[in-house]
A protein has these predicted regions:
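Soluble "head" domains of membrane/secretory-pathway proteins
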Residues: 2-180
Length: 180
């Protein structure tokens, strides 16, 4: 959420040389469903956080509010209508769904009345297709393309604090929550 302070494991995908960002020790690759922090393509001074949807070589499509990976529709089950509070209040009334990527289930928000960017892309080697869980209010790979491996900062794993300015302070319920 807006206002989250995130803990990131910068070594999840390998050890890199500072400044030139070259990987010197490979400790693994991003997996579908990982929540990853990366340098924004259009302004590398900004870090973005999104979910890995497409891996190198994947064909990723987004049609009628559903993700397709290599021609297979990703499972999505409706849960309830989202009741946002504080900084999440602007999405109140969105459909809260469980989405299953590989073996990882996570929540997403869908606003049926909002138009969505639809289309298909083949993820180039060394790149990743990223999407936000707030599907109809997310600036992600549907708009600016795939993320090159060298832009990866690390894997997000917990929210250590949230500053909710609209509720005048710390959102105590989010402290220490794990990111799935």
């Amino acid at each position: 959420l807006i206002g989250d302070f995130i803990l990131v494991n910068k070594f999840s995908y390998g050890i890199r040389l500072p400044v030139i960002n070259t990987k010197v020790i490979d400790l693994g690759e991003p997996e579908r469903g990982d929540v990853m922090v990366f340098r924004y393509l259009k302004d590398p001074s900004l870090d973005y956080i999104k979910r890995v949807i497409g891996l190198p070589g994947d064909r990723v499509g987004y049609y009628d509010k559903h993700v397709y990976i290599n021609g297979q529709k990703v499972s999505q089950d409706p849960v309830d209508l989202y009741q946002g509070v504080g900084q999440g209040a602007n999405m109140t009334g969105a459909q809260l769904n469980h989405e299953l990527l590989s073996v990882r289930e996570h929540d997403i928000l869908i606003m049926q009345e909002r138009p969505s960017i639809e289309g298909e892309v083949i993820v180039p080697e060394g790149h990743y297709f990223m999407m936000g869980d707030n599907r109809d209010n997310s600036n992600d790979s549907r708009y600016w393309g795939t993320v090159p491996e060298e832009n990866i900062v690390g894997k997000a794993f917990a929210t250590w604090m949230n500053w909710d300015a609209s509720n005048n302070g710390i959102d105590w319920k989010r402290l220490g929550t794990l990111i799935n």
